[in-house]
């Protein structure tokens, strides 16, 4: 299962963003300049007592206001509530209970979500009595907090994580490889999923934005069991006219976090765009297995060098992904579509790969004999041994005399030796260096 999602909702000016910033701290998890996300600070990672979760800040809900922008903000909040595992409903303890609070409470009850009610702006003990009128909302015990001063947040977070879904609720999904289809609007994500499923399950249209949210499709084939997640395409900031598009972007990012393999779909008839680089860069940063699919290959005039030249151009553009696997398809004609799940499974297998410690040390010892670490000052890096400490992605710890003696070029050399010796195509690998006294 992915990380739980907590939506912070309430009418305007009750302190939602203050609470969001307090919970997020400096742990904003989105790469800079992501469309409508980082700049607006609506999506971040938080942690409490070793429980990691995602928080979403929403625009203020004004139920009776028909202004277009306000209506869009209301729809944003509804989308966030739909996505959430827990809804954190914030009210203003100084202003007291309002009709708008009652309307929001009514909306939340209809959503049938786990709700935690927080009464904000209780900055001193004398104001504690202000919470009691909020029992009238019928949403359980109101919790007094001061987001600006950080008061009561520990008790609040205890209550929030208490309502997280149990980790084994969807245990059967562990058998499934989760694949997120990402890319700009209209590159053929839904068409590819429909081809794989053999049915018109998704709306397929040349109107960008027909996939508003991430949709999961379960499929079992000879290759294995898969969950295919079709996401809304990410656009350039200038094209995000509707406030609702922010939450499509958020949902795409959440889908990447919950995926094992990310498939970036690119239109062969168009150049790779900056937003393609950004979104797959995010998948790379959080260490997902990656497959790049070039769709609409049937529309390209080809000779025997076309595919190689196209792949070389992509490798240059995506230079931070030297390990990515590539596949050229046509979702429309079905060309090479039968290879998609097989290649995704290979990427996933490499993502989960474990190497025995003895074999690992043989490879590294030979690599050191072939090329000694460079001398820094009067000292040379010594590698005592290496062991694998994790998967998804494969993570290796090198125990050395002093990590400060490691030059970036030698780190790259060691990673290349591991990749030459073991197939890690389609996945990043992590190398850590720790000091061990002789």
From Swiss-Prot:
PROSITE patterns: G_ENGA (PS51712). The keyword GTP-binding applies. The keyword Nucleotide-binding applies. Residues 353-437 form the KH-like domain. GO terms for molecular function: ATP hydrolysis activity; GTP binding; ribosome binding. Residues 4-168, 177-352 form the EngA-type G domain. Keywords: GTP-binding, Nucleotide-binding, Repeat, Ribosome biogenesis. GO terms for biological process: ribosome biogenesis. GTP 2 binds at residues 183-190, 230-234, 295-298. GTP 1 binds at residues 10-17, 57-61, 120-123. InterPro entries: AAA+_ATPase, G_ENGA, GTP-bd, GTPase_Der, KH_dom-like, KH_dom-like_a/b, P-loop_NTPase, Small_GTP-bd. CDD domains: EngA1, EngA2. Associates with the 50S ribosomal subunit. Belongs to the TRAFAC class TrmE-Era-EngA-EngB-Septin-like GTPase superfamily. EngA (Der) GTPase family. PANTHER family: GTPASE DER. NCBIfam families: GTPase_EngA, small_GTP. GTPase that plays an essential role in the late steps of ribosome biogenesis. This is GTPase Der. It comes from Clostridium novyi (strain NT).
